[in-house]
Amino acid sequence: MNTSPKMEMEMKMETKAAPEAGMIKKSNEEWRTVLSPEQFKILREKSIEKRGSGEYVKLFEEGIYCCVGCGNPVYKSTTKFDSGCGWPAFFDAIPGAINRTEERAGLRYEITCTKCDGHLGHVLKNEGFPTPTDERHCVNSVALKFSSAITSQ
């Protein structure tokens, strides 16, 4: 079937708007009971943490980064790199873990968790970083929970 770009965009929007199995839906009051005030401000109100203030900016230990709101694994430490931007940076997410919403003509996208729709940060493209994707997923530390792959013996 031959479709116009407008029809393709509408079909994508319809697909994204469909409720997903396992999606977590809570009221703001319910979110406030499980998130700290700072987590709520970022995940639910789409705010941003102060540059360089996040606990995961300089962490390069092996493990998995999960959405702090719902525990959904969103990034592997193997995709993390030091971009010098002041927030944790990744070049790719775990497949199916994030949604992207275009904000700046294909150069910047808001990223949210596919399971709870929590705001994680932004993806910026074509900045010239020597990564496999030429993308920088600039993520708020407060939106993440790190699980180390290193176990105590």
UniProtKB/Swiss-Prot annotation:
Disulfide bonds join C85-C138. This is Peptide methionine sulfoxide reductase B6. Residues 28-149 form the MsrB domain. The keyword Oxidoreductase applies. Binds 1 zinc ion per subunit. Its EC number is 1.8.4.12. Catalyzes the reduction of methionine sulfoxide (MetSO) to methionine in proteins. Plays a protective role against oxidative stress by restoring activity to proteins that have been inactivated by methionine oxidation. MSRB family specifically reduces the MetSO R-enantiomer. Keywords: Cytoplasm, Disulfide bond, Electron transport, Metal-binding, Oxidoreductase, Redox-active center, Transport, Zinc.
